[in-house]
């Protein structure tokens, strides 16, 4: 990236924030998503990002020393649906056994603070694998959604 003082490299964290979060045309997924939600302490070696701006299904890039996997979005990502898409992606990443009382409390807070409704889940669930809805039911997280 060009700056007034020369060329500057964007850190992987800066890439996620500057290019994908503020403009709301993408979101972090995988272990990085679980870590950002506070339900995992694992720090991934590879950051996965779903974005509207990717034409290839999957593409790996290097940002500094960090490997970043860019994935084509399942549907158009915008500020209105990014929270529910992140939630559904999280449900696609984990198994029902993952939801102990602590993780359920964190997810319940995420659902509440982002106003995720059953209607928004119903609207976006068809673009995700069946595993997402099965995990919602088996984990009993579905009962925390208004």
Predicted regions span which residues?
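Hydrophobic alpha-helical interaction segments
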Residues: 71-146
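Positively charged, aromatic-accented nucleic-acid-binding surfaces
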Residues: 17-18, 25, 29-32, 90, ...
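Surface-exposed beta-strand edges and their flanking turn/coil or helix-capping segments
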Residues: 41-43, 62-65, 82-85, 102
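A diffuse structural propensity rather than consistent per-protein peaks
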Residues: 9-11, 29, 117-118
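Short beta-edge/loop segments at beta->alpha junctions of small alpha/beta modules
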Residues: 1-19
């Amino acid at each position: 990236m060009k700056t007034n003082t020369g060329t500057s490299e964007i850190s992987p964290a800066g890439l996620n924030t500057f290019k994908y979060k503020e403009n709301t045309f993408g979101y972090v997924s995988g272990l990085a998503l679980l870590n950002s939600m506070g339900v995992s302490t694992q720090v991934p070696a590879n950051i996965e990002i779903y974005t509207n701006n990717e034409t290839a299904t999957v593409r790996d890039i290097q940002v500094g020393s960090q490997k970043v996997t860019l994935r084509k979005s399942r549907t158009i990502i915008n500020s209105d649906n990014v929270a529910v898409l992140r939630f559904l992606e999280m449900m696609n990443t984990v198994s029902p056994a993952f939801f102990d009382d602590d993780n359920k409390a964190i997810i319940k807070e995420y659902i509440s603070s982002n106003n995720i409704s059953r209607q928004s889940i119903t609207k976006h669930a068809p673009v995700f694998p069946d595993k997402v809805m099965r995990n919602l039911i088996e984990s009993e997280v579905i009962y925390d959604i208004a």
